[in-house]
Amino acid sequence: QSYGGCKVGVGDVLIGAAAVAADYNGAAKASHIKDKLIEMTHLNETLYCCGIACSAEGHKTESGNYIIDLLLANVCKQNVTRFPYEIVRLAEDIAGGLMVTAPSEKDLRDEKIGPYIDKYLRGVATVTTENRMKILRLIENLALGTAAVGYRTESMHGAGSPQAQRIMIARQGNLAHKKELAKRIAHISELSLIHISESTRRSYI
């Protein structure tokens, strides 16, 4: 039930790749690009926070081992089933369609069509077309290629599918305690509820 830290490292790479792609596309200064990178960072660091929290709130067992806080660990994993997908979506948005439509390296090296590819697929003048294509291929691999197996589907089902975490959150969430806190603040006595008429009770609801 302690799962999620590895996804943050991959997320850092993907966020960095998206930022480089924005530079190479000449769009890094656009406000919506900046906002997407902020959102990606926010989601990724939230996963990191959850991982740190469930570890810091862990406790020592009788055998001398340490176990993470089960509620926070399952909250972490539940977030892992969602956030990487949104991070990938934003990376694809920033990268642009060329990420999946770019010609092959063989085409780029071709004596006849290579110069045309170099000319028409260049982004900013200071960056080579080859470097632009390299960063897009990296994003493609993390979002859709072989690396996506570990970042997307494994995030969904690794260490338990989403419903497994929800079962544990329901068990560990201590809802009865939360209800008691609310009743205390509202000065509700269970005994007094007996004297409330049915019609009055419905009006509260």
Which residue stretches match the model-derived regions?
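Single conserved hydrophobic/aromatic residue that forms the stacking wall/gate
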Residues: 194-205
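Short coil/turn segments at secondary-structure junctions
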Residues: 2, 28, 64-67, 71
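Loop-to-helix element that buttresses phosphate recognition and phosphoryl-transfer chemistry
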Residues: 38-60, 79, 92
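Glycine-rich beta->alpha junctions and the first turn(s) of the following alpha-helix
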Residues: 1-44
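Secondary-structure edge/capping motif, primarily at the C-terminal ends of alpha-helices
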Residues: 19-28, 51-62, 94
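Alpha-helix capping/hinge segments and adjacent helical runs
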Residues: 71-193
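Short, charged, amphipathic alpha-helical segments
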Residues: 34-38, 67-74
